[in-house]
């Protein structure tokens, strides 16, 4: 299934049905009074979050959605049926914006939330409403209300507790596959991950969700590489796990490249709690590991955790630390 996280769609509520002009007809009664019924209300447009969905692909190829119109009123004071509301399911994490993106209408953060974005049009009045002492046989009725229509922008931000960040080929996808049952595409070349991957980490009787996004490169916040499109998917997380390729010749430069892109993208990411991991330590000597840890500690003033996603060394410690951080944030 394609991962789609941005779409533009057209929505319209159902129009109200027209009121009816009718007069009572009955044997032996020459001039029955007005008995035109009211039109039915048009259907509304409602969005609903659904935890079974994780992409907006359903709105990629079909872009126009209209609720059902209300029926016209009938004789014998019978009202027209109301139109069916249109319910559109979206993944948790979906945000509904105006077409230009300047107005946020709603943000779905839990399952089964509903938001009525357009109300159906009111039904028109039948001629029975207009009978008076001076007009016993009115032919007046009103038309149903025309419902609102609009183009809107849907944007999906995945919900996760932990976000994995790092340069391409830092080992994020391997880390995700080791700690979860997720099966991301993994290979030894940059940009293996082309879409965000989610996995659930189980620690004893507790769990949390972790997200791996495509690797960041310099200029990602401006659209370079793939990362800028997907950085939004880690804005909601509680903690970042920053993986650094231990086999790199300049681990400090690698760290600073990613860190700068996070800070330039948004204050949300800039202020996230960060756990820094020196990965691929299985290909380094103890002396090389310590040397690179010392350089990173000096540059970041933070604790550096040596790990290997190939041998699993140090990985469990990071998982437990992430869980503890998440619990402290809630």
Swiss-Prot record:
Gene Ontology MF terms: GTP binding; GTPase activity; magnesium ion binding
Say yes or no: keyword Metal-binding present. Answer: yes
What cofactor is needed? Mg(2+)
Q: Which residues cross the membrane?
A: none
Localized where?
Cytoplasm
Sequence positions that bind GTP: 166-173, 191-195, 212-215, 279-282, 308-310
Task: Offer one example of a GO biological process linked to this entry.
Answer: ribosome biogenesis
Entry EC number(s)? 3.6.5.-
| UniProtKB keywords | Cytoplasm, GTP-binding, Hydrolase, Magnesium, Metal-binding, Nucleotide-binding
Using the record's annotation, list all stretches that form the Obg domain.
1-159
Record InterPro entries: G_OBG, GTP-bd, GTP-bd_Obg/CgtA, GTP1-OBG_CS, GTP1_OBG_dom, GTP1_OBG_dom_sf, OBG_GTPase, P-loop_NTPase
Q: Where does Mg(2+) bind?
A: 173, 193
Domain OBG-type G span(s) in chain numbering: 160-327
Name the GO cellular-component terms: cytoplasm
Q: Looking at the Swiss-Prot or TrEMBL record, what is one Pfam family this protein matches?
A: GTP1_OBG
Name the job this protein performs: An essential GTPase which binds GTP, GDP and possibly (p)ppGpp with moderate affinity, with high nucleotide exchange rates and a fairly low GTP hydrolysis rate. Plays a role in control of the cell cycle, stress response, ribosome biogenesis and in those bacteria that undergo differentiation, in morphogenesis control.
Q: How does it assemble?
A: Monomer.
Family named by the database record: Belongs to the TRAFAC class OBG-HflX-like GTPase superfamily. OBG GTPase family.
Q: Which NCBIfam families match?
A: Obg_CgtA (TIGR02729), PRK12297.1 (NF008955), PRK12299.1 (NF008956)
| Protein name in the entry | GTPase Obg
Q: What is the lineage of its organism?
A: Bacteria, Pseudomonadati, Pseudomonadota, Alphaproteobacteria, Rickettsiales
